[in-house]
């Protein structure tokens, strides 16, 4: 059994020789418990099927895109390793039609949940793309000693490895092509045996995050437990209570929802039961937030519940990978600190100690798929990638101020820092959930719209009362001029990475006939004449936004 002599398979074999059969992936959805020997055997079997079925040599196969039609699972991990073994690039088909339009996949690897579905049948009938089933715990597993590394087959670090898509928060998702070096850079320290770490991964996290996360955990000798919980956060809490999980990655939305489950359900249980859940939350060594900034009330809740130990903040992007890591002090800060640069990451700011964050890292994208001009435009003359994020340097750490285009908008000639206004709104004691949105108005460019959910014991909240309460925190021009209160069943539209889908949210909650007349009577509006009564011409920091 011959494998490429690259860092990925070298590391897998190193751990497998010391811990061949110990469970490294516990897939609760497929009821599969597998060790490194199972992973290698299934991946090698699938890699050989790929070569045989395509009737081409490995070098030709290696130039192809191979689709993966499977949720995050043991199967998707096997598929990923098989694709890497033949030197091809994997592409998730979670957005099937869009992905197939963007890349010419030569084959699709299909998980058991999709093999008999209408989607898989249509895929083969309408596209003619070869479809292969992903093996699970194949019989005839050989001893680990039978695997060898082919020193004459070392893939280039820059060989395409996988295709991801951006979240689509501000527009159509973009195909981001990454090289093998993206993975190589993430496990530079070799681990020779299985550790006692156990990471819980559930299906609400976006596919690209899970893809990287599962592979990296097993390459680091860390066990992975996979769940299809369908946003059943009460079940995640129950798993916390068992005091076995040591690592978990959540988006800010998930940390918020977990907080609400504790406050509304768990906290009302008998005290011994409550303490059992608290011990479980404190047992986790590395709770991580990624994909956004935690609101201060959420950050404070977890800090208190975990006895002064904060949720760890990391920052990165689909295009650039992990860029900064916050230490405990920065993670606990009420500022939107994203910490300091991760290893092997070089940064600079466009305006000295503030401005757009520009980075160099081995994890940077190869290219935007089918977009050479866009790819060229996202690098400066020195080869730094333009993240589009505005930050400010404070000592060794960076403070996140928002996305250059998505988190700042114009109100007349003024710059509205959406995240800052949202943070102030969230801090009001009667606000449970808060969103600040730009609603277009030809007379002033954009209105500042507040979309909020109230705490259960507060009902008499108006636009004027909110503006009054914000008056000590914000200048007049940053205060909301539109308000809509979310009802019990109202849910804010989100992308697959759990970020707020801004355009859809505005369309759903602020539909209108014209500038001052909205289609829903529950929207409270401050008329343009009332706005003009305020002095909006005071000393301001004016910047060119676009």
Swiss-Prot record:
Biological process according to GO: fatty acid metabolic process
Alphabetical UniProt keywords: ATP-binding, Ligase, Nucleotide-binding
Transmembrane segments: none
Pathway membership, UniProt: Secondary metabolite biosynthesis
Enzyme Commission number: 6.2.-.-
Binding site for CoA: 412-414, 482-484
Residues engaged in binding ATP: 166-174, 300-305, 403, 499
InterPro entries assigned: AMP-bd_C_sf (IPR045851), AMP-binding_CS (IPR020845), AMP-dep_synth/lig_dom (IPR000873), ANL_N_sf (IPR042099)
Family: Belongs to the ATP-dependent AMP-binding enzyme family.
Function summary: Acyl-CoA ligase; part of the gene cluster that mediates the biosynthesis of oryzines, natural products with an unusual maleidride backbone. The two subunits of the fungal fatty acid synthase oryfasA and oryfasB probably form octenoic acid. This fatty acid is most likely activated by the acyl-CoA ligase oryP to give octenyl-CoA before the citrate synthase-like protein oryE catalyzes condensation with oxaloacetate to form tricarboxylic acid.
Protein name: Acyl-CoA ligase oryP
Gene source species: Aspergillus oryzae (strain ATCC 42149 / RIB 40) (Yellow koji mold)
Lineage: Eukaryota, Fungi, Dikarya, Ascomycota, Pezizomycotina
Gene responsible for this protein: oryP
């Amino acid at each position: 059994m011959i494998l490429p002599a690259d860092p990925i398979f070298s590391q897998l074999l190193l751990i497998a020789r010391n811990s061949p059969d110990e469970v490294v992936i516990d897939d609760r959805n497929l009821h599969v418990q597998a060790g490194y020997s199972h992973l290698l055997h299934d991946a090698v079997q699938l890699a050989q099927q790929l070569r045989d079925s395509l009737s081409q040599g490995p070098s030709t196969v290696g130039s192809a895109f191979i689709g993966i039609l499977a949720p995050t699972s043991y199967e998707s991990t096997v598929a990923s390793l098989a694709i890497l073994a033949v030197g091809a690039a994997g592409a998730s088909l979670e957005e099937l039609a869009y992905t197939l339009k963007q890349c010419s996949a030569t084959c699709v690897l299909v998980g058991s949940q999709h093999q008999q579905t209408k989607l898989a049948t249509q895929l083969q009938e309408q596209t003619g793309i070869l479809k292969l089933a992903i093996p699970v715990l194949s019989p005839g597993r050989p001893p680990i000693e039978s695997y060898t590394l082919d020193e004459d087959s070392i893939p280039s670090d820059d060989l395409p490895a996988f295709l991801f898509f951006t979240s689509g928060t501000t527009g159509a998702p973009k195909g981001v092509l990454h090289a093998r070096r993206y993975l190589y850079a993430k496990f530079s320290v070799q681990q020779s045996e299985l550790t006692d770490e156990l990471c819980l991964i559930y299906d609400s996290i976006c596919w690209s995050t899970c893809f990287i996360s599962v592979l990296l955990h097993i390459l680091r000798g860390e066990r992975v437990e996979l769940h299809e919980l369908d946003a059943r956060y009460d079940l995640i809490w129950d798993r916390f209570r068992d005091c076995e999980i040591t690592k978990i990655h959540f988006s800010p939305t998930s940390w918020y929802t977990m907080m609400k489950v504790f406050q509304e359900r768990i906290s009302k249980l008998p005290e011994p039961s409550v303490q059992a859940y608290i011990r479980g939350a404190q047992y986790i060594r590395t709770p991580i937030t990624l994909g956004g900034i935690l609101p201060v009330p959420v950050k404070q809740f977890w800090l208190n519940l975990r006895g002064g130990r904060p949720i760890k903040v990391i920052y990165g992007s689909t295009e650039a990978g992990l860029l900064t890591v916050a230490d405990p002090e920065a993670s606990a800060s009420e500022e939107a600190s994203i910490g300091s640069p991760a290893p092997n990451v070089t940064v600079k700011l466009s305006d000295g100690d503030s401005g757009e964050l520009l980075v160099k890292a081995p994890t940077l994208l190869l290219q935007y798929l089918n977009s050479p001009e866009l790819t060229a435009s996202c690098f400066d003359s020195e080869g730094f990638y333009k993240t589009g994020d505005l930050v400010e340097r404070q000592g060794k750490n960076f403070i996140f101020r928002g996305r250059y285009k998505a988190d700042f908008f114009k109100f007349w000639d003024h710059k509205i820092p959406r995240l800052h206004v949202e943070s102030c709104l969230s801090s009001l004691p009667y606000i449970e959930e808060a969103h600040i949105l730009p609603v277009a108005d030809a007379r002033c460019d954009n209105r500042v719209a507040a979309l909020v959910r109230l705490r259960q014991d507060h009902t008499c909240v108006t636009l004027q009362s909110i503006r009054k309460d914000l008056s000590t925190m914000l200048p007049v021009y940053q205060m909301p001029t539109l308000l809509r209160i979310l009802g019990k069943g109202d849910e804010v539209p989100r992308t697959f990475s759990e970020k707020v889908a801004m355009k859809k949210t505005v369309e759903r909650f602020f539909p209108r006939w014209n500038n001052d007349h909205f289609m829903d009577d529950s929207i409270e509006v401050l008329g343009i004449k009332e706005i003009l009564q305020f002095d909006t011409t005071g000393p301001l920091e004016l910047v060119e936004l676009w």
